[in-house]
Amino acid sequence: MTAAETRILELRAELDQHNYRYHVLDEPSIPDAEYDRLFRELKALEAEHPELVTSDSPTQRVGSAALSAFTQVRHEIPMLSLGNAFEEVDMREFDRRVNEGLDLPAGDLFGGGAAVEYSCEPKLDGLAVSLLYQDGVLVRGATRGDGTTGEDISVNVRTVRNIPLKLQGSGWPATLEVRGEVFMSKAGFERLNAAQLEAGGKTFANPRNAAAGSLRQLDSKITASRPLEFCCYGLGQVSADIADTHIGNLERLKQWGMPISRELRLAKGIDECLDYYREIGERRNALPYEIDGVVFKVNSIASQRELGFRAREPRWAIAHKFPAMEELTELLDVEFQVGRTGAVTPVARLQPVKVAGVTVSNATLHNMDEVARLGLMIGDTVIIRRAGDVIPQVVQVVTERRPENARPVQIPESCPVCGSHVERTQLVKRSKGRETVSEGAVYRCVGRLACGAQLKQAIIHFVSRRAMDIEGLGDKTIEQLVDENLIASPADLYRLKYEQIIDLEGFAEVSSNKLLKAIEDSKRPALARFIYALGIPDVGEETAKVLARSLGSLERVQQALPQVLTYLPDVGLEVAHEIHSFFEDSHNQEVIGSLLAADQCGLVLQDQGELGAEFAASTTLGGMLDKLNIPSVGPGAAQKLADKFGSLQGVIEADWLDMRQALPEKQAKAVREFFDNPANAQLAQAIEQQLQAFGMHWQSEKKVVAGLPLAGQTWVLTGSLELMSRDVAKDKLESLGAKVAGSVSAKTHCVVAGPGAGSKLAKANELGLKVLDEEAFVAFLTEHGVPT
């Protein structure tokens, strides 16, 4: 090694150590002038020896040539958003759910319950990013994006001073994805805006916008000039576990050079969490950065895994938001808009006012119950808040300023769009097998797809990227199609002719043919996409995937009883009833029939087949008895009944003596009384019959999964696949019992490598793992009876 190489390595190590002490420990050991001298020496040596410059050198933070666009990055583990709490009662409800999910004893709603340990830290108001390290070196930075797909901003994150280009120390996993927030301090924000003003450039409304705009610059030299900082708050994919607790993980990351929150704290129980929230709230204005709340996470990693996730958020974490900034203004009018499901909702038209740096002239009123709760009248002076710092909301009426000519807000008797009758429907709450009428009500236009507003929103949803994905059908085009009476339902899209399209504004020969081709190309949708496209109330993309993966066919989804639907992951009784009601509706049946009829629209659904293996294996007699919500009978007692009698009919017909052999007197009496009610017995039998008609049987206990050909195996997908998406490939592997992981390790059984496979394929070859190309993978699936 030459003297220059040796000195360059020494300088890099020394500068990395000083960066760590300055940005992470806040304990600088040399003056800034000495740091600058060392930095200049390294820069000069690298200029003399450009062949020795590496991407992890401290000198590489200055930015490089501008990009034309960012490339997309798929997150192997989705970057989910957090659920929100706005009041103390929301936090106590979260704590109750955590205790319930961990099967811990919980007190009453305000009693604190069991003392679960939570990590606490301020919720920085910035931009969420993912940093991927391979063997301790930063190889990629990405934005959160939609949680599944983000943008590759690697060249920009390298310019953020306190992000280590190379980890300190040793002992880190080979693959380590760090997640955190890039933000701008209040002081940095003020300096940036002052500089922008002086240069005649654009100023930013708030530090968050400044941070987001700076990080997404195509010219990384601009990013390098901005006062950005990073704070780590968690992990994504890792090739090996680090610690048993969330705080333990963060402490290890700090040792490796990652900046973590100086306000990080452990709280025992919900009351300590609330104390922390109040303390941070009192200090909020004094903190050097903007925050919009506090994040609480169950500290135990094992407990986090046990609690798992909802469709879009973890069950083990929550963001307790601070009250947003508020302003006074005048309510000029209340107008009514009609949504996709026909709900008629009020919208406040306001005297424009600035709230948190944004001019607000409209605000949500949610529903007429909210209008009544507020006691709102047109002409009132109201307090406007940006709820969650995003959606403007009317939160209070200043009644002492009410003018004499103030007018009450009245729901229209007929739809403001189509003139159809507006009906009031009382809301019904369903829980644990019981229905109760709630105080709330919803007003709906009964015009359905005859209502232009509902039809437009339904079509916009139907053609959207995550639904049928029909390119070229923008909102304005859909408005034209509806206004010109060219479509009256989603099925009419597939009946459009060239002559009709070319007459639309903005269309010519090429664009008309392109749209017709896009419509034709959408005729073979995956089952999950089709279900999502139908616009079933409360059924989002993730729930649609669960329905498709678990039930395997549209016919089963259409037939499923609400009680059977609750057997699916994350489908509660409310959503189950919405799904069931949607498919019971004769108009919806007609539209679906037209879409699927070969002599009409001719859609052919893909990925239909048998019941999902995990779903089939998860439904047992004991589980079914538990889900009947028999009073005093929990999972343990339900399993005792299943073990004793072996069939539902056996439980229903059991005499008192046999029942007492299985259960204590109180529980036995509850079971007997439950099934003595003919309606309960008939419902239980109907559920059993449907489950069995779907292909399930009580012998399909968990052990059935173990009988699947890939049970216990871990597979990895890498590169691009040409015959199917990676999501589809993942579903097919999971149907055979495999676990699909995001990283390669010695425990990986097989790697499926498509074109463009990189480090994962190299790692697989290094470890001597089995590797299949796409052709071999398709043959493997065919051999195991999985359609491709």
Curated annotation (Swiss-Prot):
<feature type="binding site">
    <location>
        <position position="121"/>
    </location>
    <ligand>
        <name>NAD(+)</name>
    </ligand>
</feature>
<dbReference type="GO" id="GO:0046872">
    <property type="term" value="F:metal ion binding"/>
</dbReference>
<dbReference type="Pfam" id="PF12826">
    <property type="entry name" value="HHH_2"/>
</dbReference>
<feature type="binding site">
    <location>
        <position position="181"/>
    </location>
    <ligand>
        <name>NAD(+)</name>
    </ligand>
</feature>
<feature type="binding site">
    <location>
        <position position="321"/>
    </location>
    <ligand>
        <name>NAD(+)</name>
    </ligand>
</feature>
<keyword id="KW-0460">Magnesium</keyword>
<dbReference type="InterPro" id="IPR001357">
    <property type="entry name" value="BRCT_dom"/>
</dbReference>
<dbReference type="InterPro" id="IPR013840">
    <property type="entry name" value="DNAligase_N"/>
</dbReference>
<keyword id="KW-0464">Manganese</keyword>
<dbReference type="InterPro" id="IPR018239">
    <property type="entry name" value="DNA_ligase_AS"/>
</dbReference>
<dbReference type="GO" id="GO:0003677">
    <property type="term" value="F:DNA binding"/>
</dbReference>
<dbReference type="GO" id="GO:0006260">
    <property type="term" value="P:DNA replication"/>
</dbReference>
<dbReference type="Pfam" id="PF01653">
    <property type="entry name" value="DNA_ligase_aden"/>
</dbReference>
<dbReference type="InterPro" id="IPR004150">
    <property type="entry name" value="NAD_DNA_ligase_OB"/>
</dbReference>
<keyword id="KW-0234">DNA repair</keyword>
<feature type="binding site">
    <location>
        <position position="451"/>
    </location>
    <ligand>
        <name>Zn(2+)</name>
    </ligand>
</feature>
<comment type="function">
    <text>DNA ligase that catalyzes the formation of phosphodiester linkages between 5'-phosphoryl and 3'-hydroxyl groups in double-stranded DNA using NAD as a coenzyme and as the energy source for the reaction. It is essential for DNA replication and repair of damaged DNA.</text>
</comment>
<dbReference type="InterPro" id="IPR003583">
    <property type="entry name" value="Hlx-hairpin-Hlx_DNA-bd_motif"/>
</dbReference>
<protein>
    <recommendedName>
        <fullName>DNA ligase</fullName>
        <ecNumber>6.5.1.2</ecNumber>
    </recommendedName>
</protein>
<keyword id="KW-0520">NAD</keyword>
<keyword id="KW-0436">Ligase</keyword>
<dbReference type="InterPro" id="IPR013839">
    <property type="entry name" value="DNAligase_adenylation"/>
</dbReference>
<feature type="binding site">
    <location>
        <position position="415"/>
    </location>
    <ligand>
        <name>Zn(2+)</name>
    </ligand>
</feature>
<dbReference type="InterPro" id="IPR041663">
    <property type="entry name" value="DisA/LigA_HHH"/>
</dbReference>
<keyword id="KW-0235">DNA replication</keyword>
<dbReference type="Pfam" id="PF00533">
    <property type="entry name" value="BRCT"/>
</dbReference>
<dbReference type="GO" id="GO:0003911">
    <property type="term" value="F:DNA ligase (NAD+) activity"/>
</dbReference>
<feature type="binding site">
    <location>
        <begin position="32"/>
        <end position="36"/>
    </location>
    <ligand>
        <name>NAD(+)</name>
    </ligand>
</feature>
<feature type="binding site">
    <location>
        <position position="445"/>
    </location>
    <ligand>
        <name>Zn(2+)</name>
    </ligand>
</feature>
<keyword id="KW-0862">Zinc</keyword>
<keyword id="KW-0227">DNA damage</keyword>
<dbReference type="Pfam" id="PF03120">
    <property type="entry name" value="DNA_ligase_OB"/>
</dbReference>
<comment type="similarity">
    <text>Belongs to the NAD-dependent DNA ligase family. LigA subfamily.</text>
</comment>
<feature type="binding site">
    <location>
        <position position="297"/>
    </location>
    <ligand>
        <name>NAD(+)</name>
    </ligand>
</feature>
<dbReference type="InterPro" id="IPR012340">
    <property type="entry name" value="NA-bd_OB-fold"/>
</dbReference>
<dbReference type="GO" id="GO:0005829">
    <property type="term" value="C:cytosol"/>
</dbReference>
<dbReference type="InterPro" id="IPR036420">
    <property type="entry name" value="BRCT_dom_sf"/>
</dbReference>
<feature type="binding site">
    <location>
        <position position="418"/>
    </location>
    <ligand>
        <name>Zn(2+)</name>
    </ligand>
</feature>
<keyword id="KW-0479">Metal-binding</keyword>
<feature type="binding site">
    <location>
        <begin position="81"/>
        <end position="82"/>
    </location>
    <ligand>
        <name>NAD(+)</name>
    </ligand>
</feature>
<feature type="domain" description="BRCT">
    <location>
        <begin position="705"/>
        <end position="788"/>
    </location>
</feature>
<dbReference type="InterPro" id="IPR033136">
    <property type="entry name" value="DNA_ligase_CS"/>
</dbReference>
